């Protein structure tokens, strides 16, 4: 069976970045530290916040994109029924068991999912996509070979899904994309945003010639410049939007200029889509063979 070593590496890399992002969590959210009896914890320094924003800006989009790619790979090789069975065990049961353990750790059961929200959303995508893919018109549409112009439209769509998510969540607020905390806390905007990346992963499977195009040195340099520029624009838009708030704990209660929030949402979309393309190109260029470390990380 063919392995996509570039995407295996990217998946493992995104997993490791999750550890980097969550390690200083107590310093980002001092109120969370109080749950463990830690009071007056020193807030994180700004450079730590910047690293956190950088990782969080592309990690989950990459995760859902790769999930879509590997979903269609399994369906094409083993069929929809086997795909569903595999994902129910690997994703559904994992989410249910470990979210339940998290939930009862405080002595009460209130359907909390905490950091496993992405497994919950992924399971929803798996069920919905399995039904969607049975329709021939949808299957043909997702498997079509894309000309470059359509590819640009797809990237534009990914960018616009962020402000669209704000609209669907009925909130022009920087925290509009806040992830769910319970099974009943789903937001339609978040689902549309993340499912869009899932579908792009599906489309990418039928257009693997894109790997060849974006792994060229010139393409990587251009994507790298665009990605870095997009991130600095993202930081600037963050400053314009929430820079007025002295204490981040007050963000939820603060009113913001809708135009600034819209600009910030577009910058989030630009940043996420460019970094996804850049990392896929980078991994495709330099990761062309398997290794024991990558295989171990992927099988975790």
State what each model feature region is.
Residues 1-300:
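Alpha-helical transmembrane segments and their immediate juxtamembrane cytosolic regions
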């Amino acid at each position: 069976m063919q392995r996509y070593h570039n995407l295996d590496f990217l998946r493992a890399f995104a997993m490791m970045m999750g550890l980097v992002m969550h390690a200083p969590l107590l310093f980002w959210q001092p109120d969370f530290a109080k749950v463990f009896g830690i009071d007056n914890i020193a807030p994180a320094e700004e450079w730590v916040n910047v690293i956190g924003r950088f990782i969080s800006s592309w990690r989950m989009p990459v995760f859902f994109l790769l999930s879509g790619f590997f979903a269609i790979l399994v369906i094409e090789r083993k069929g929809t029924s086997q795909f569903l069975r595999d994902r129910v065990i690997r994703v559904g049961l994992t989410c249910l068991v470990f979210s339940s353990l998290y939930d009862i750790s405080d002595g009460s059961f209130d359907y909390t999912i905490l950091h496993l929200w992405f497994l919950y959303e992924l399971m929803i995508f798996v069920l919905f996509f399995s039904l969607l893919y049975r329709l021939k018109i949808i299957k043909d549409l997702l498997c079509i070979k894309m000309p470059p112009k359509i590819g640009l439209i797809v990237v534009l769509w990914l960018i616009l899904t962020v402000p669209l998510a704000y609209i669907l969540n009925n909130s022009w607020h920087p925290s509009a994309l806040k992830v769910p905390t319970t099974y009943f806390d789903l937001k339609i905007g978040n689902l549309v945003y993340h499912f869009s990346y899932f579908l792009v992963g599906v489309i990418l499977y039928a257009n693997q010639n894109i790997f060849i195009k974006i792994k060229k040195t010139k393409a990587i340099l251009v994507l790298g410049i665009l990605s870095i520029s997009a991130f600095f624009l993202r930081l600037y838009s963050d400053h314009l939007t929430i820079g007025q708030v002295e204490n981040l704990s007050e963000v939820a209660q603060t009113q913001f200029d809708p135009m600034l929030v819209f600009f910030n949402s577009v910058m989030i979309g630009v940043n996420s889509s460019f970094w996804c393309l850049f990392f896929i190109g980078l991994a495709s260029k330099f990761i062309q063979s398997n290794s024991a470390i990558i295989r171990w990380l992927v099988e975790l």
